[in-house]
Amino acid sequence: YTSLDPVLQEEAEEACAEQNARMAGMGPDLESALVAMEPETGLVKAMVGGRDYYESQWNIATQGGQPTGSTFKVFTLVAAIEQGIDPDTKIDCTSPMDRPGAEPLENFGGADYGIQTIENATALSSNTGYYRLTEEVTPAAMNEMATRLGVGGEFVPNNTPTAVLGTENC
């Protein structure tokens, strides 16, 4: 018995192939992976572990220890909402963002989004906006939310705002 849905599996494979095509030329080791789960049951409905498991014998989705990328932004968002911060609240998404003692922080491609609502910052996946929001809600609240929502295993929280940018390996 498998919980995989053949239609969703095909769509997942197509989505990853399209993403891999978009990333072509951006770096030799870039490839996408995807896991789609049914929230009510935790059953895996679709999974793509990379370009070709038979070639690499490596499933990025299950064996990865990969940086979390922008996925931690959702934990900051939920922590913010729980703290009473409305998604219509404005947040500074300008780029680059100076940080004392650290390299300037930029949005992907150096994009300067200006002032945005948190909702728009989420749609844009603004690194600078979410860094600032994480400072406001606290990295500890973001990590606590991640744990409450099921991030576990070898996850060791990094209680710095950069964790929202994908500096954690899970």
Role assignments for model-derived ranges:
Residues 1-23:
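Conserved, well-ordered alpha-helix/loop/beta-strand core segments that scaffold catalytic motifs
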Residues 2-10, 65-71, 112-116, 124, ...:
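Soluble non-cytosolic domains of exported or imported proteins
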Residues 12, 41-42, 64-91, 121:
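Active-site SXXK
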Residues 28-54:
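A short, well-structured edge-of-sheet supersecondary motif
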Residues 52-64:
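A short, polar/charged loop-to-alpha-helix boundary motif
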Residues 85-142, 159:
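Conserved catalytic neighborhood of penicillin-recognizing serine enzymes
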Residues 137-154:
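Short, charged, amphipathic alpha-helices and their helix-cap/turn boundaries
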Residues 152-170:
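Active-site-proximal helix/loop microenvironment
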